[in-house]
Amino acid sequence: MKQMSYVTRWLYSTSHKDIGMTYLGFGMLSAMMGTGMSVMMRMELSNGNSQFFHGNNQAFNVMMSGHALLMMFFFIMPVWMGAFGNFFLPMLMGAADMAFARLNNISFWCLPPALVCMVCSVLMEQGAGTGFTTYPPLSSMSAHSGPSVDLAMFAMHLTSMSSLLGAMNFMVTVLNMRTMGLHMVNMPLFAWAMFLTAMLLLLSLPVLTAAVTLLLMDRNFNTGFYEVGAGGDPVTYEHLFWFFGHPEVYILMMPGFGVMSHMVSTYSKKPMFGEMGMLYAMGSIGFLGFLVWSHHMFVVGLDIDSRAYFTSATMVIAVPTGIKIFSWLATIYGGELRLGVPMLFALGFLFLFTMGGLTGVMTSNASMDVAFHDRIFIYYVSFFLYTLYNMYNNYTNNNTAHKGRHCANASYNNDINNLVSFMDKNEYIKMFWVGLMDGDGSMQVNHWRKKNLQYRLIMKTSNLESNYNMLMLMAKVMGGTVRISKKKDNVMWVVDSKESIKDMMKMFDKYPLLTSRKMCQINFMKKCMKLNYMPAEGGYPREAGTDWYLLNRNYKYNDQLNMINTFNLKLKNKSFMNALPEGHGMHHMVKHSEYFKCWLSGFMEAEGCFSIRLNKSNSFSMGQNDDFYLMEEIKQFFNATNSVRNSYKNFYCLEIYKRIMLNNIITHCSNYPLLGEKKESLMKFLK
């Protein structure tokens, strides 16, 4: 098959990720244009006299109209819905792509001609200086007789078509493309936000299209829908425009609500507080958004009953909005807060969104609007920009990878770069590797003809593609080589370089092994290396290491047995943690809980087992020889009520089957991901 060219890939792409990136690039181009117009307005207003337009007020109005339309229809909507929605929604749903891949491509290619029309409307003749609302009679032939307003209307038609096609695609994807076992109520909040936004688009955009079409007919076909002299009414246009215009505010904000929830949950390391409440709040905001449009029209001559209704309905929206704000604050409260750059933006958004909402209290009051008339635009712009601009900062500084329980089965399709956002990727892999070494690893010291000692670190797993990829990731960070055994039944990670092993010994001091057997192995190896490679420091002859090895190689686990026996005696009279042997790695684990969580994921990859029983119930089990105290600590970490049982000789097993405790395990694996075969087992387990 002929390889697709670079140009063909981007022009004819049906990949949701490629299309998402084209949306992003298009949005950035539009943002630069809109920002340029904003700079021109700022320069003009920087001094009391005319600075830039030399008294040409029409040019200023054209810049303001172009800026608003570009930023809303060509920047915010394509970037938030098109780019982030297309890129992340299929992954969150566990789907291979969007439901209608070619329709997805068409919805994007409606935008470039729309942008051309929009730019031409600014540049041709006197420009479209109508404001972004394009109210008649200011937008009628009597005020703007050139083609500029017509081109702006065509641009809005094309963007509406693009958004409608995208909205249908999003809704069908959410309804029909969810992975097995992912019910609607268990979807991530970002997926719900995109679904509700698509519903708002589908219900509101046809009304805008109708209003704009009637305006075009008035301008070009001599109709009189909005012409007072012909029996029409310009207020009709206002009702139609704002029936779209107010849901449009929530169309622009709703995806940010979903992202904000994921961001706060991730950087607080807690599940979202009141997740169902957040879902109902978003639904309520979307529903109420269709019932309050005339609060933009308080001074056009509404009767007092209508003004009273729209004032009351507008204030009711504050209730679900307050629920969302307090749920975000409750999630942050008591969490392990990490103030990364995205979280700083999230905290800034919380403050600015609250301030912007307070301006909405003033603009919702019909009585105050009469006094604020001619100044209401200032309040409206402050409300609009406080909320949207800072939510966009939030959006662009978040990686959107949700760490919650409900999207674990879908987000596991992402790689380690997306999943581990709260720490350095390499550090996570190192801590994960230590846990994997505790379970599947081996530290070997051998001799060659009783003269030279040879050292090796080996990790052996079953020969599966997922395990091979995991060990290749380990080798990339830790060094070493990955090879497949002669019988093709195992894949191994091996390090036999003395210098590399010395470096790893230092890393084990930072991230200690926690199982008794591996602790004894590393102590034995360190002793041999000290005697063999550091004779000058220790005052030992070079052959001392080999002699000591030959003398003690058959007794290297005696320390482990003594450690366990001592621990069991102490446990009768002391608390669990106080009974631990002196210097044991569990003391480090308590001091560095973040390390233990990462280590535990590696240990679960090696020793854990996700099972589906014959009665269709789920369970998780893991065990370890001799290390009762370690299994007891893991039990306490997951808040498990099951006892650690001695199933065979000194093999201690922990089995968890209650749903609440299983949820704790799933949440842990979402935050600290498994990387190999157990990752696939967990995905099947969730289905």
UniProtKB/Swiss-Prot annotation:
Localization of this protein: Mitochondrion; Membrane
GO molecular function terms attached to this record: cytochrome-c oxidase activity; endonuclease activity; heme binding
Region annotation COX1 intron 3 encoded: where it falls in the sequence: 375-687
Alphabetical list of PROSITE patterns matching this protein: COX1, COX1_CUB
EC number annotated for this UniProt entry: 3.1.-.-
InterPro entries per record: Cyt_c_oxase-like_su1_dom (IPR023616), Cyt_c_oxase-like_su1_sf (IPR036927), Cyt_C_Oxase_1 (IPR000883), Cyt_c_Oxase_su1_BS (IPR023615), Homing_endonucl (IPR027434), LAGLIDADG_dom (IPR004860)
Record-level GO BP terms: electron transport coupled proton transport; intron homing; mitochondrial electron transport, cytochrome c to oxygen
Functional note: Mitochondrial DNA endonuclease involved in intron homing.
UniProt name for this protein: Probable intron-encoded endonuclease aI3
